[in-house]
Regions:
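P/S/T/G-enriched low-complexity
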Residues: 1-352
C-alpha cells in the first residue's frame, strides 16, 4: 500500500549550551610521512608523541629506551603492552650504540582528540533523518510526497519572518524563528533543508514553548504572536495538508527556560502546547540530548517534562484549577501501551 504523506516540523534547540561537548571524546590517528626512526627521534620529540599500530588496529605509545653504562649504552625504541607488573616490552627494529642511528623503518602515527558538540551531533542526526525521509519518499513502492519544516528556538522573542536571524546586540542571540516553511523532500529540497541545518549556530536561551508555538503556526499556516493573543494570516506559510500525517520532532539538551536553569513556567507551557498539538492529531517526538536523559523516568523534572511533551503521554497537561499553566499541577495521565516517542541520545552514535 502507498505510504501516507508526512508533514514534519523539526523543532531544534539552538541555545548556547548546544555548543557543549556531547559524550566522550575520541582519538583520530594520522600516519606520519617519516619512515626511518632513531632513538633521538622518539626521545627528542618533547611536544609530539608517536604511536605504533599493530595488525589488529590497536595503537601503542612508542617509547625510547637506553640500557647500559655510559660509553657502552645501547639505544632502542618500542612499546609496552599489558599493565602494571605485567607489562611486556615490544622492541621495534634493532639496537645501536649510536642514538641517531636508524633503528626501525616503518609508519608511526600522531593523534589528536576529537570532540563532537551537541549542535554538531544534532545537525548530523537531523541531516541523516532528512536523507532517510527522502529515500522513503522515492522508494519504488512509496511514490509519495513528504515535506519538512524547520523551526529553531532559543531566545524568548520571535522573528516574524522565515529565515535564520539573530538579535542585533552584543550577544547576538538567536531569535526563535521559522527557518524553513514546509519544503518538499526531493533532491532539491534535501539540499535546501540540509543547508539550512548546517547554517544553525548555538546562542541564546531554551525557549521551547516559543518553538512549539511556531510549530503550531507552521501546521496551521498562520502566525501566532504575543503568546497566542492574536493571529495574523500570512500566505507565505503553506500549512499542513489535510491528507498528511502531521509530526513534530523536538530536539533539546534539557532545561526549558527563558534564561537559565529549569523554568517551571516554561516547562508547563510547553506541556500544554504539546497537548494541544496531540489533541489535534499531531504525533510529537522528543529527543533529549542531556546527561541522565531517561524515557523510563517520570520523577525527575527533565524526564517528566520530556515525556509530557511527547506522545508517550497524549493527555499530559500542566494547568491549575484557574486554567493557568503550572508545573506543580503537571499530570501526565496514562502512558500509551504501544510505541515510544521520547528518546535519549547522549552521544553522536545514538543520535544517528
Amino acid at each position: 500500500s502507498k505510504t501516507t504523506p508526512l508533514d514534519i516540523v523539526l523543532v531544534l534547540d539552538v541555545s548556547g549550551s548546544m555548543d557543549d561537548d556531547l559524550g566522550e571524546s575520541t582519538w583520530e590517528y594520522t600516519p606520519t610521512d617519516e619512515q626511518r626512526w632513531s632513538y633521538s627521534d622518539i626521545n627528542g620529540s618533547r611536544w609530539t608523541t608517536y604511536y605504533f599500530r599493530d595488525d589488529d588496529g590497536n595503537y601503542y605509545e612508542v617509547e625510547a629506551e637506553s640500557d647500559g653504562s655510559w660509553g657502552n649504552r645501547q639505544y632502542s625504541i618500542g612499546y609496552y603492552t599489558g599493565s602494571g607488573f605485567y607489562r611486556d616490552w615490544n622492541q621495534l627494529g634493532t639496537t645501536s650504540r649510536n642514538q641517531n642511528a636508524n633503528l626501525w623503518t616503518g609508519t608511526l602515527y600522531t593523534r589528536q582528540e576529537i570532540t563532537t558538540s551537541k549542535m554538531e551531533a544534532m545537525q548530523s542526526a537531523v541531516n541523516g533523518f532528512i536523507d532517510q525521509v527522502a529515500e522513503n519518499a522515492a522508494g519504488a513502492d512509496n511514490d509519495v510526497t513528504h515535506r519538512i519544516s524547520i523551526v529553531k528556538f532559543a531566545d524568548d522573542s520571535y522573528a516574524d519572518s522565515v529565515g535564520n536571524d539573530r538579535q542585533d546586540d552584543y550577544y547576538a542571540y538567536n531569535y526563535t524563528q521559522i527557518v524553513k516553511d514546509f519544503t518538499t523532500v526531493d533532491a532539491a529540497g534535501v539540499q535546501q533543508l540540509t543547508g539550512a541545518i548546517e547554517a544553525l549556530e548555538p546562542a541564546g536561551a531554551t525557549s521551547v514553548d516559543y518553538g512549539l508555538t511556531l510549530a503550531q503556526d507552521v501546521l496551521d499556516g498562520q502566525w501566532r504572536h504575543d503568546g497566542g493573543e492574536w493571529w495574523v494570516e500570512d500566505p507565505t506559510l503553506t500549512g499542513a495538508r489535510q491528507d498528511a500525517k502531521q509530526v513534530v520532532v523536538v530536539f533539546t539538551d534539557g532545561e526549558p527556560n527563558h534564561g537559565n536553569d529549569f523554568d517551571d513556567d516554561v516547562a508547563a507551557t510547553a506541556v500544554n502546547l504539546a497537548h494541544d498539538l496531540k489533541n489535534n492529531g499531531v504525533t510529537v517526538y522528543t529527543i533529549g540530548m542531556f546527561e541522565d536523559a531517561d524515557p523510563d523516568d517520570i520523577r525527575d523534572n527533565f524526564n517528566k517534562y520530556m515525556n509530557g511533551v511527547s506522545s508517550n503521554y497524549p493527555n499530559a497537561t500542566a494547568t491549575n484549577r484557574f486554567g493557568q499553566a503550572s508545573w506543580n499541577f503537571c499530570n501526565l495521565g496514562t502512558r500509551v501501551t504501544e510505541g515510544n516517542y521520547y528518546f535519549a541520545a547522549d552521544d553522536a552514535e545514538e543520535l544517528e
